[in-house]
Amino acid sequence: MVGLVPAGSAWGGRALAVLGVTLLVALARGLLPFFLGGRDLLWGQSGEASVLGVVEESRRVVDGAIQHTVRRDLSKRGLPSPSQLLSFSKLPEPTSRAVSRAAEIMEASVQAVRTRVYGKLGRSWPLTDTLPEAVLDTIANASGCRPHMLPPRCPDTCLARKYRLITGACNNRDHPRWGASNTALARWLPPAYEDGISEPRGWNPHVLYSGFPLPPVREVTRQVIRVPNEAVTEDDQYSDLLTVWGQYIDHDVAFTPQSASGAAFGAGADCQLTCENRSPCFPIQLPPDASGPACLPFSRSSAACGTGIQGAFFGNLSSANPRQQMNGLTSFLDASTVYGSSPALEKQLRNWTSAEGLLRVNTRHWDAGRAHLPFMRPPAPLACVPEPGTRGTAGAPCFLAGDSRASEVPTLAALHTLWLREHNRLASALKALNAHWSADTAYQEARKVVGALHQIITLRDYVPKVLGPEAFQQHVGPYEGYDPTMDPTVSNVFSTAAFRLGHATVHPLVRRLDARFQEHPGLPPLGLQDAFFPWRLLKEGGLDPLLRGLLASPAKLPVQEQLMNEELTERLFVLGSSGSLDLASINLQRGRDHGLPGYNAWREFCGLGRLHTRAELRSAVANATLAGRIMDLYGHPDNIDVWLGGLAEPLLPRARTGPLFACLIGRQMKALRDGDRFWWESSGVFTDEQRRELARHSLSRVICDNTGLPSVPADAFQVSRFPQDFEPCENIPGLNLDVWREALPQGDACGLPDSLDNGDVVLCGEAGRRVLVFSCRHGFKLQGPEQVACSPRGGAVRAPVCRDINECEDASHPPCHGSARCRNTKGGFRCECTDPAVLGEDGTTCVDSGRLPKASLVSIALGIVLVVGLAGLTWTLVCRWAHAGRKASLSIAELGGRGAPPPGRGAGQDGASGSLVPPLGPQGRTRAVDPTSSRSHVAQGSPA
């Protein structure tokens, strides 16, 4: 035994040595590439191909999540769920979707880099670490984010100086992105994220704020905000139209797209189903004692390119460039609700065959000879679904307008329709006055007037009623001209909190009135849950009954203990029994999603002073009961969500909001006015005579000119009684368009060219000279000069050419999803799918239709025909064979009968049998008998 120990020890040592070397080799093979790769990524020595691989993998992850969402929505049978309807109503137009997708690909790429570089090292991601500039550029370019992070190219033409760009870009020549569509919302205070960069407050329910957890937003709704419909107090001063105008104008200046995907990237969690916080899913948790699901679906707003997790690697590390949200619209009061905020949407909205510069109208439905909004072209959202069982309304498409939310409620669609009619009325009249104008000039001049009327009605008639005269004077004040240092970009707190004060003024009923402004006998009042989406506008009386109801019905008064009616908190977007949504909880959750600082921070911002105790809150809201409920939920004034805090304040004198929202709304309206180079009062935008005519106009006059109402209130926002408060339309001042008459100067040397195919020509004058400005429609590129000065010698001007852009050749930003193939069309492109896949609602992604390919169906049909044919042929052959067999048997029988012995005699000598069958021989063979011989022979198988 003693002799075996050394031997065993030696053997064990050799084994351990071999094992150690093996482990070292394995570790070297496994870890060395990682450390080298990490070093390369961190210190800029990685090849571009590896970075592109990360981006491409991230693209597949994001597109997979998007495709899952599209497939889920397309496969939905029956009525959509409330959360699907909400996502449909927030579906951005294609340009915004492309920007949102690019931002999510970039975010996923940076996440992947973080995981690869730091995750395998077993340590957290330090915000102070940055990626090399070359790597950042590669990610930004490959993801598609780079073009949306750079200043746009501003055209230097007479036309660009005369009319605003459809995107809002280049309004400020020194800051061309200010107020432009698809740029980040402005921050007036640094955001408040739980991790300092991206995660919302409340993402981790165990995190405490001032020693207290944040209350679930649904609990805030239940205990503070919700009020039964029957308990609503009506406004004795202002009409429902004031509320609807506020919603309409909100949709003119702000739209924040949700995440392009409704599923967690890489994790596969569906935001419609999961109750976990897995970006972009941020579900609204329900109380444990609530029946039904444990949460309400909620998707985060898409991040702007280069912000949040992606932004931590960019520029200013002291602020870490936290997550920002995108505004898909122009910030300006420019009637983008009518004309859109992108060239692609503007192209869809215009009637390109008219010489008057008209907008498209509905060709299937008319309202007593007046136009309706056109329908969206397929593929269109499935959201605009009628009530089940309603005859003649199945499959009504959504309306197409400058904003995708035009179809949400009939009252909102009514205002969109009103302004569509007003544009076409103005464009036709202006073209009649100026026969030499091109269609584009008539369109642009009418658009300019409609935009000015939006500005006048909002700043002159709407905002002072909301803020009250004193707060309006304090925060907005008189117009003193264009201020190029004023940033007009809509702020996050305005769009996400302050301007949502209008939700507290929504009446639970939509009322439709007859010509005497009485309840319409055939059109009873509708609860909001029965009034979503557009078909009632088409099938139930058109605009006039709705507008009568808006003019003569009071709005809901925003009473402190009646903040929001239960039509919005309990039955939002309900079309069936598939659940509900809660608008109040959505507003609170959206504020946290956007990183809005709390109520106290904004009070300090507006000079109102911070609150520290329950008693101070009670004093600020002047309501002990309400203050007690809020403090019981939040624990400390610092924790109160800004939207709730602003709503809880008592109304200012002759106002419909408290001091905080008056400050925030007033500040934003002043920025929208003073920071807009094309504001209607700005020098050079209109002539003095034109400004005087515009100042005479009103919303009441617009209603007179575009509906069948013979009389209206002088102030459309003042709740009015019929007939004493109504004026005949002939007494309501309107525009005298003669001041827009433009006579060509005598001896004008400009020879107008023939119409420019797929483009427009505008005669423009500036600095004492006249020029021709050429532009191409969306999808075409100008080849030749943009602008040509008129020659003193006269003569025809040779126009440039508009060439089609082949979007399908853009490999860096393919217009179609990888699941689809791109086909170039004149002025655009078309995404096509291989059967049985079909295009999803985004128009670019192919999803499974749930059926067999058409070719397979044809093959199956042909196969069935072939099988049936073969079966028939086989049956025919069998029948013929059987028939032939029977005939053969009969022939044998007949033959046997003729060769049989006479009756009474058997075969052979015994005569005992009358059988026709010959006697069997040995082994069962028949024995033939030769009648001529006494001898016999054996026959094989057949008679002789």
Curated annotation (Swiss-Prot):
Region (Disordered): 895-944
Disease named in the record: Defects in TPO are the cause of congenital hypothyroidism with goiter, a simple autosomal recessive trait observed in Toy Fox Terriers (TFTs). Neonatal affected pups exhibited inactivity, abnormal hair coat, stenotic ear canals, and delayed eye opening. Palpable ventrolateral cervical swellings were evident by 1 week of age. Serum thyroid hormone and thyroid-stimulating hormone concentrations were low and high, respectively.
Every EGF-like domain range: 804-847
Binding site for heme b: D250, E408, H503
Domain Sushi: 748-804
Sequence positions that bind Ca(2+): D252, T330, F332, D334, S336
Organismal lineage: Eukaryota, Metazoa, Chordata, Craniata, Vertebrata
Assigned protein family: Belongs to the peroxidase family. XPO subfamily.
Main location: membrane
Pfam families in alphabetical order: An_peroxidase, EGF_CA
Name recorded for this polypeptide: Thyroid peroxidase
Topological domains annotated Extracellular: 31-858
General function of this protein: Iodination and coupling of the hormonogenic tyrosines in thyroglobulin to yield the thyroid hormones T(3) and T(4).
Post-translational changes noted in the entry: Heme is covalently bound through a H(2)O(2)-dependent autocatalytic process. Heme insertion is important for the delivery of protein at the cell surface.
Listed GO biological process terms: hormone biosynthetic process; hydrogen peroxide catabolic process; response to oxidative stress; thyroid hormone generation
Enzyme Commission code(s) on record: 1.11.1.8
Disulfide bridges in this chain: C154-C170, C271-C281, C275-C295, C606-C663, C704-C729, C750-C790, C776-C802, C808-C822, C816-C831, C833-C846
GO molecular function: calcium ion binding; heme binding; iodide peroxidase activity; peroxidase activity
Quaternary structure and interacting proteins, as annotated: Interacts with DUOX1, DUOX2 and CYBA.
Stretches with biased composition (Polar residues): 931-944
Ranges facing Cytoplasmic side: 880-944
Record's signal peptide: 1-30
Annotated Gene Ontology cellular component terms: extracellular space; membrane
Reactions that this protein is recorded to catalyse: 2 iodide + H2O2 + 2 H(+) = diiodine + 2 H2O; [thyroglobulin]-L-tyrosine + iodide + H2O2 + H(+) = [thyroglobulin]-3-iodo-L-tyrosine + 2 H2O; [thyroglobulin]-3-iodo-L-tyrosine + iodide + H2O2 + H(+) = [thyroglobulin]-3,5-diiodo-L-tyrosine + 2 H2O; 2 [thyroglobulin]-3,5-diiodo-L-tyrosine + H2O2 = [thyroglobulin]-L-thyroxine + [thyroglobulin]-dehydroalanine + 2 H2O
Protein keywords: Calcium, Disulfide bond, EGF-like domain, Glycoprotein, Heme, Hydrogen peroxide, Iron, Membrane, Metal-binding, Oxidoreductase, Peroxidase, Signal, Sushi, Thyroid hormones biosynthesis, Transmembrane, Transmembrane helix
